[in-house]
Each structure stands twice: as structure tokens, then as C-alpha cells.
């Protein structure tokens, strides 16, 4: 912890116009990290081919040049100030990069229209490569944090992952008060992650239970930080709103407390901004009052509690002082921005001289099918999962005949229909004998894909951590697979993955997948199997788009391995057979490892960097094993898995997992009882709760769960060592792969 800090004077705060009741401090080493900021700027703009200026440093009275981190984490340990500054700066760069990309939505409309209807689209795969590079920059800092303090770094990553799973960039619509708005903003603002960052910087460690206890107090301070950001960013958000309206003809109202007050209390813009400032003070006073209440209830609090509170307080007061001076947030006066009002859910300039009618988007949706509109909208907004769209039309000049229900047949030539009768009128025969017309040879009309794709589209739409695509992107930093080939490989993996999930859920009699009904529960077994088969064929068709002659061989070999491994898993379950640990590992190497090998081998085959450095190591084999054993373990102990799949769902389906093998591999009476339960379990409906609890207790008593956990921790160490060996062969680090691994740690 820093031995001392610099207190910002009341005079300086008054000159800046701040209202926080918390003190404003700055780290004594604030000048030392300016060079870190410049290095991040140079690196990001060089890698991303941009010229972004985050404006996170400013010239402060009596201080000179300083960065926001020095104000928001003034008690940061001196040896951690640099990494906290770099992480904060990279976060600002990423925010600005994606914010600027949002302005380009109008271009994306045109590109996606051409893409959907066969035209030449802008190469988004190159953009995706740039995004991967930006993630690599951030990942390198996060990995460095793990080496400094793995416990606090992991706390931050868990918070980050939790927020990503539940957060969407929602709209103000439906929020009827500030009380509804503030929890919504806490969820998607990232302030909880910054609280963990501050704790990392200060070295403050609290248990999960302690954090939950202090949450109501800390949230009040976080609310004030959110409102501070809303107040200072408002003019910038208004400018962005009108820029987007000018470009596309529409825009969502800013997600900002100023809007909330204007809509719910009917206040003017100026009055609403003043209400925001008043609420900043109210939230901070509430925070301090709750601390005092806690002290009165419990007596003197642990020092770490006070530091935890200060982390939230200085984030608020420091960010306000910084925001009041930095040029990142221009004022309405500096923007020469008139007052705005809300009319029919839209922002309008109050001045009548300002043009009210926005320029409409150049490309319209007139004449485009509704299904295509939704695809384009979802792609432009970046919210859709990848859904296959393989449409084909009969060749020009093709002729086909179709029987129709009234006894006529339709001859279709070049898309024009000619109707002919068959000697019957209104169902009455005009002759003595029924004359039957045969369909002549010729092209046929393909059935639409909507029905066969429906189950696939459903499972592809479910929430997912998208581990496989992240793995592919991370490996591509080494392998340099051309963009089109990389896109094909991702589609191949997605088709196979979702196909296997649909079939697995049927084979396992599962009812939940990621907290939602399994596909076959909605579409039935037969239709789901048909969709899974179609996805498999689509994957094979995609392989033909790859350039390497070995691609088909790789695909067939690993898909065969996948099914061989699955056959062992299903056989053991059906016969209640307990394999040896070695047999189990062989099954995993085939069933789970096949997908990882398929990714790597296809990428190496298409790589612009000739090498076999990854598959020659045991890294991929270890990764497949870790992935499966971790899944076995989490299914039994994780509350998240319980929510998504049900309590100990593997026991319901009779799966022979590694913890179960450890439990029943001996000849003890307890092992025999567990075997008997599995042998006589109901095929449909799984096991009663009390039997699952009994089996779980036996796993705990026999040390099966602890043995599995110990093995996983040993494998974690081996995976990092294996990754470092691969990094040595490539001659470069891959922080994205390491970060992906560390996010899986148990």
C-alpha cells in the first residue's frame, strides 16, 4: 500500500465544480505512470491501425499531468500502480474502439445487405482479426496480474465473467424510476469489476461472504459513481445520439440518468442534470450512514473493511474530479450544444432553428423478407449467434412439373407457372377412366430450410461461453490462417458442436441445456435428430471450402474418433460398467479431445505458417482431458451447473464420470450399493433427490471429489507448462490462450 497520498484541496475541488462528499486523493507516484500510458497508446494504435486518443490524462492544477487511475486508486501498492494504469488505459481504448465502430453501423447495413443477397461485402473477418489483437493486449495484462496475485486476479475475472453472462447493452425503455435504473446500470457499467481491480491494486482480500455482507453499503457508493459518469458524459452522449440519427435515421435514447429524470419526472434537461448532482450527494451520504450503522451494530470494523469501502469511495470522488477537468468529457458549452427535450421517445433540440427531421438511411429494407431484416438487424447489433443460411435456387431455364391439389399440374419454366387440367373439373371425371399424369423428368424445387434448421437455430441461440471460437482466435495469433479459411473452420466446429449437443441430450435423457429446455423437449426426438444430421452434413460441406487436400481426411478421422469415444461412454452407461481410469482417459481422448484436435489440425493445414508444433506436443491431449474432467467435477459440485442443467444431472443420466469411477472402483459394500442404484435407476426421469444426495455423500466420504479436484489442479499446472513449451517453439507468448485456460480453473 502507498505510504502516503496527496490530498486535493477544497479550493481545487470547488474550482472544478465537484460535489462528492468523499475526499479526493491522488497517488504520490502519479507522474511515474504517464510513460505507461504513452506505451499503451503507441502499442494499441500500432496493432489496431488506429489513431485513438482516450484523453485519460490531463493537466491538473498544482499537479501537472496525471492519469485517472492515480485518482481512483490512490492507495494502490507502488508495485501495482503500473499494471493497474495499463489495464485501465487498455479498457478505455477498447471502449473507444467499439464506440467508434458503432458509428459505422450505417456502413454495416449496406455490407450485410450485400452479404445476405450475394453481393460483395466488406471483409469483416479482417476486422475480427483486429478485435483479437485488442483482446490479446488486454489478456497479456490480465495474465501478468495472475502472476502477481492469482487470488485477487481470479476474483476480478470471476466478476467479469459473471457480468458478461447477464449483461446486455439495454435501453431505458421500461425503466420507470431511478430505483429501477441504478441496479440496471450497476449490472452493465463494469463498476463491480473496477471494485475488484481496486482491491487488486491495494492488496485487499475479502471472502465472498464478506463481500456479500458489505454489498448494500458499497453499492450506494457505486451508484454515485454511475451518476457521476452520467452527468459528465451526457453532452457527449447527446452528440452521439444526433450523429447516429443523422447517419441511420434512428437511435436509442442514451442510457443515462438524465434521460430517466426527463422521462419520469418531466424535468427539463438542465433540471434533470441538477437532480443527478443532488442524487450523487444523497447516495454518498447514504453510503457513509450505512457504515456508521454497521459500526454501531458490530463495533470497530476490520481494517480491510474500511479499505474496501475506500476503494468504492475514491473511485467515485476521483473519477468526478478527473472527469471535471479532462477533455474526454466536453461540456455543452464547449460543444455549442442547445438544450434538448424528449418528444415521443426521441431527443429533439429545443431550439426551433435546429433541424428536426433526420437524414434517412440510404439503404432501405423495402422489399426485403422479414426474416432477412431480422438477420441483418441482429448482425449489425452484434447480438446473433451464427445461424447457417444455405439457400439454393433451381438453375435458370430449368423445367419442373408439380402436382397440385385440384387435379391440375403446374409446369414451372424460368419461374413462370402454366396450369394445365387433367380432364377433370371440380373433382368430377370428364371421361370413363381416371387419367393419371406422371411427373416428367427435370429439376426439382428444394424444400425450404426453415423447418430443418429450427432446432439448430434454437440451440445455437442459447447462452454460451463460446470457448471453441475463442480458442481458435487465440491459436490464430500463431498460425495466421487466412480469414476465409478461419471462418470456415469456425463454422465446421459450430456445426459439429451443436449437432453433438442435440444428440447428446437425447442420448442422455437430459431436460435442461444451459438453463433452458433441451432442443428435443421442444421439437421432439425425431426432428432434433434430423436437424443434428443436417448440421453434420453442413459441416462436411463446409470442409470442401478449405484449400488443404488433407482437410477431408482430418475431418473424417476426428469425427470417427469422436463417435468411437461416445460409443464407449454410452456403452458403459447402458451396461453400468466401471472402466479403469486408463480406459476412461482413452474415451475422453477420443470423445472430447477430437474436437480440439480437429480445430488445431485444420488450422495447421490451412496455416500460412508451415508447422506442426502444436499437435506434436501433448498440450491438446491434456486440454481435452482437462475440459472433460472439469465438466464431470463441476456437474457434481457447481451451483452454476445446477442452475443450467439441474442438480447432479450426470447422476440422473447414469454417466460414468471420473468421480464415480473413483467411488465404485473397489469392492467395498458402499461401492456395491452405488452400483446397484445405477443399475436399477429409472431410464426416464433419473434418480430421486435423496439417492443423488446419498451418492454424492459417498463420493465425499471415499475422497472421490477431493481426488478429482487434486487431479484438476495438477493438470492446471501441467497445462500452463505445456503452453509455455509451445510458446517457446513459436517464439512468442500467447496471453489469450493462457487467459482462456485460467478462466477454466477450479
UniProtKB/Swiss-Prot annotation:
Task: State one molecular function term (GO).
Answer: metal ion binding
Q: Does the keyword Amino-acid biosynthesis apply?
A: no
Cofactor mode of binding and number, as noted: Binds 4 Mg(2+) ions per subunit.
Q: Which reaction does it catalyse?
A: isopentenyl diphosphate + (2E,6E)-farnesyl diphosphate = (2E,6E,10E)-geranylgeranyl diphosphate + diphosphate; (2E,6E,10E,14E)-geranylfarnesyl diphosphate = quiannulatene + diphosphate
Q: Which residues bind dimethylallyl diphosphate?
A: 513, 591-592, 628, 635, 645
Q: Which InterPro entries match?
A: Isoprenoid_synthase_dom_sf (IPR008949), Polyprenyl_synt (IPR000092), Polyprenyl_synt_CS (IPR033749)
Q: Which residues are involved in binding isopentenyl diphosphate?
A: 465, 468, 497, 514
Record keywords, A-Z: Isoprene biosynthesis, Lyase, Magnesium, Metal-binding, Multifunctional enzyme, Transferase
Name the positions where Mg(2+) 4 binds. Answer: 504, 508
EC number(s) per UniProt? 4.2.3.-, 2.5.1.29
Which stretches does the entry tag as region Geranylfarnesyl diphosphate synthase?
338-746
Q: Does the keyword Metal-binding apply?
A: yes
Output this protein's name: Quiannulatene synthase
Which species does the entry assign this protein to?
Answer: Emericella variicolor
Amino acid at each position: 500500500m502507498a505510504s502516503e497520498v496527496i490530498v486535493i484541496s477544497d479550493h481545487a475541488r470547488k474550482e472544478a465544480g465537484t460535489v462528492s462528499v468523499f475526499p479526493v486523493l491522488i497517488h504520490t507516484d502519479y507522474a511515474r505512470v504517464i510513460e505507461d500510458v504513452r506505451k499503451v497508446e503507441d502499442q494499441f494504435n500500432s496493432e489496431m491501425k488506429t489513431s485513438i486518443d482516450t484523453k485519460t490524462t490531463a493537466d491538473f492544477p498544482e499537479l501537472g499531468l496525471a492519469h485517472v487511475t492515480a485518482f481512483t486508486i490512490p492507495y494502490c501498492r507502488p508495485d501495482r500502480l503500473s499494471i493497474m494504469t495499463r489495464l485501465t488505459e487498455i479498457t478505455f481504448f477498447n471502449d473507444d474502439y467499439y464506440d467508434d465502430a458503432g458509428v459505422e453501423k450505417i456502413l454495416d447495413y449496406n455490407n450485410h445487405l450485400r452479404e445476405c443477397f450475394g453481393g460483395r461485402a466488406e471483409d469483416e473477418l479482417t476486422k475480427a482479426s483486429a478485435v483479437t489483437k485488442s483482446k490479446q493486449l488486454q489478456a497479456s495484462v490480465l495474465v501478468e496480474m495472475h502472476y502477481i496475485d492469482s487470488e485477487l486476479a481470479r476474483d476480478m475475472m470471476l466478476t467479469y465473467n459473471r457480468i458478461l453472462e447477464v449483461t446486455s447493452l439495454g435501453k431505458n425503455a421500461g425503466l420507470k424510476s431511478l430505483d429501477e435504473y441504478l441496479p440496471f446500470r450497476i449490472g452493465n457499467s463494469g463498476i463491480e469489476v473496477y471494485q475488484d481491480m481496486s482491491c487488486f491494486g491495494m492488496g485487499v482480500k475479502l471472502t465472498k461472504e464478506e463481500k456479500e455482507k458489505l454489498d448494500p453499503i458499497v453499492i450506494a457508493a457505486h451508484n454515485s459513481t454511475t451518476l457521476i459518469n452520467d452527468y459528465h458524459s451526457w453532452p457527449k452522449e447527446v452528440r452521439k445520439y444526433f450523429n447516429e440519427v443523422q447517419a441511420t435515421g434512428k437511435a436509442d435514447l442514451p442510457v443515462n440518468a438524465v434521460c430517466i429524470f426527463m422521462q419520469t419526472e418531466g424535468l427539463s434537461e438542465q433540471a434533470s442534470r441538477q437532480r443527478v448532482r443532488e442524487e450523487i450527494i444523497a447516495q454518498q451520504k447514504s453510503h457513509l450512514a450505512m457504515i456508521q450503522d454497521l459500526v454501531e451494530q458490530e463495533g470497530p470494523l476490520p481494517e480491510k473493511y474500511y479499505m474496501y469501502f475506500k476503494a468504492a469511495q475514491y473511485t467515485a470522488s476521483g473519477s468526478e474530479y478527473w472527469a471535471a477537468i479532462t477533455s474526454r468529457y466536453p461540456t455543452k458549452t464547449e460543444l455549442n450544444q442547445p438544450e434538448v427535450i424528449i418528444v415521443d421517445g426521441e431527443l429533439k433540440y429545443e431550439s426551433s432553428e435546429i433541424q428536426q427531421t433526420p437524414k434517412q438511411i440510404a439503404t432501405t429494407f423495402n422489399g426485403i423478407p422479414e426474416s432477412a431484416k431480422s438477420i441483418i438487424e441482429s448482425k449489425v447489433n452484434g447480438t446473433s449467434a451464427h445461424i447457417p443460411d444455405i439457400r439454393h435456387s433451381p438453375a435458370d431455364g430449368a423445367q419442373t412439373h408439380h402436382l397440385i391439389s385440384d387435379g391440375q399440374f403446374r409446369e414451372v419454366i424460368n419461374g413462370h407457372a402454366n396450369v394445365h387440367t387433367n380432364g377433370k373439373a371440380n373433382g368430377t371425371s370428364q371421361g370413363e377412366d381416371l387419367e393419371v399424369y406422371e411427373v416428367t423428368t427435370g429439376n426439382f424445387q428444394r424444400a425450404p430450410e426453415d423447418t430443418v434448421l429450427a432446432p439448430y437455430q434454437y440451440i445455437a441461440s442459447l447462452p454460451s461461453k463460446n470457448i471453441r471460437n475463442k480458442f481458435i482466435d487465440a491459436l490464430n495469433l500463431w498460425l495466421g490462417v487466412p480469414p476465409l479459411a478461419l471462418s470456415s473452420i469456425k463454422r465446421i466446429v459450430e456445426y459439429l458442436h451443436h449437432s453433438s449437443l442435440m444428440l447428446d441430450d437425447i442420448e442422455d435423457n437430459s431436460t435442461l441445456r444451459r438453463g433452458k429446455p433441451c432442443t428435443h423437449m421442444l421439437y421432439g426426438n425425431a426432428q432434433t435428430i434430423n436437424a443434428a444430421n443436417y448440421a453434420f452434413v453442413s459441416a462436411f460441406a463446409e470442409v470442401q471450402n478449405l484449400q488443404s487436400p488433407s482437410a477431408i481426411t482430418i475431418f473424417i478421422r476426428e469425427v470417427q474418433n469422436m463417435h468411437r469415444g461416445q460409443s464407449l461412454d454410452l456403452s458403459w452407461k447402458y451396461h453400468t460398467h466401471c472402466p479403469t481410469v486408463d480406459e476412461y482417459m482413452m474415451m475422453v481422448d477420443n470423445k472430447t479431445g477430437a474436437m480440439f484436435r480437429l480445430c488445431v489440425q485444420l488450422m495447421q493445414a490451412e496455416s500460412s505458417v508451415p508447422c506442426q508444433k502444436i499437435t506434436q506436443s501433448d498440450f491438446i491431449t491434456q486440454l481435452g482431458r482437462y475440459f472433460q474432467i472439469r465438466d464431470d467435477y463441476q456437474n457434481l459440485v457447481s451451483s452454476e451447473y445446477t442452475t443450467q442443467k439441474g442438480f447432479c444431472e450426470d447422476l440422473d443420466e447414469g454417466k460414468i464420470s471420473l468421480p464415480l469411477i473413483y467411488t465404485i472402483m473397489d469392492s467395498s459394500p458402499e461401492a456395491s450399493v452405488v452400483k446397484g442404484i445405477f443399475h436399477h435407476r429409472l431410464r426416464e426421469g433419473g434418480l430421486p433427490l435423496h439417492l443423488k444426495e446419498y451418492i454424492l455423500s459417498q463420493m465425499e466420504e471415499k475422497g472421490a471429489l477431493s481426488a478429482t479436484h487434486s487431479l484438476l489442479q495438477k493438470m492446471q499446472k501441467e497445462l500452463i507448462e505445456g503452453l509455455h513449451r509451445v510458446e517457446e517453439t513459436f517464439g512468442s507468448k500467447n496471453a489469450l490462450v493462457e487467459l482462456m485456460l485460467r478462466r477454466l480453473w477450479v
